[in-house]
A protein has these predicted regions:
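Glycine-rich loop-to-alpha-helix module at the N-terminal edge of alpha/beta enzyme cores
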Residues: 30-119, 130
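Rossmann-like NAD(P) dinucleotide-binding subdomain of oxidoreductase/dehydrogenase enzymes
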Residues: 121-213
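Terminal low-complexity tails and localization/encapsulation signals of metabolic enzymes
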Residues: 1-34, 67, 71, 121-147
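Alpha-helix N-cap/helix-start motif
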Residues: 16, 43, 80, 98, ...
Length: 213
């Protein structure tokens, strides 16, 4: 039985906790795989890898970050059928619905490619006597998204494209019931040029969620 693992440091890695849960094909009711459930220690290691990648990613010019997201968007456009099939096999929605959710997520990716224009700071002169006001837009660091079963591609794409465009590193904890779409997107982000550690996928249940929170 195939075991679905995590995506840490730019590559897929096997779980070490020894805990798994089955993944079913809703069309047949048969088990298609099992997914590793991360321990709190594994979550901590994944977050540490993301933190290590953060300084270089935050220092990457916004335009370069946007170029990577633009390449990712093109991969989504070219391979939408592939990702839709992965979603259908684990979630059970029909292919047309799966493509629809991907397309809605792609709209956010497209928006994020315009982030360089939105990341400009502001300077206001003479707000007071000999006082100027300066504002800077800077990344926060490592951020996380915990996403539900019903939209395994769209809801993550509501989160990570903007976070990445703004210079943050992102840790995604997808539903353990349909975990594979997250890994597909992680591989395509890497193919688009995203540096290792900037995007992480941790599979898991309540223990992983509690560790992230």
């Amino acid at each position: 039985m195939h075991t679905i693992g995590h995506f840490v440091g730019g590559s897929q890695v096997a779980g070490r906790s020894g805990r798994t849960t089955p993944v079913f094909n809703p069309a047949t009711g048969e088990q298609s795989a099992e997914v590793a459930l991360a321990s709190a220690e594994e979550v901590g290691a994944a977050v540490a890898a993301a933190r290590a990648a953060f300084p270089a990613w935050a220092a990457t010019p916004p335009l370069r970050r946007a170029r990577i997201l633009n390449k990712f968007l093109r991969l989504l456009e070219e391979r939408i059928d592939e990702l839709a099939a992965v979603i259908t096999a684990e979630h059970g929605k029909v292919l047309s619905d799966a493509k629809g959710e991907i397309q809605r997520g792609m709209e956010v990716v497209e928006f994020a490619t315009g982030a360089p224009q939105l990341l400009k700071g502001e300077i206001t002169e003479n707000v007071g006597t000999r006082v100027d006001s300066h504002s800077l837009r800077q990344p926060l660091g490592v951020v996380a998204g915990i996403t539900p079963f019903n939209f395994p591609a769209m809801v993550p794409m509501w989160m990570f494209p903007v976070a990445l465009a703004c210079g943050n590193c992102f840790v995604l904890k997808p539903s353990e019931r349909d975990p594979s779409a997250a890994l597909v997107m992680a591989e395509w982000l890497k193919e688009a040029g995203l540096p290792d550690g900037v995007f992480t996928v941790v599979q898991g249940d309540k223990e992983a969620v509690d560790a992230l929170l």
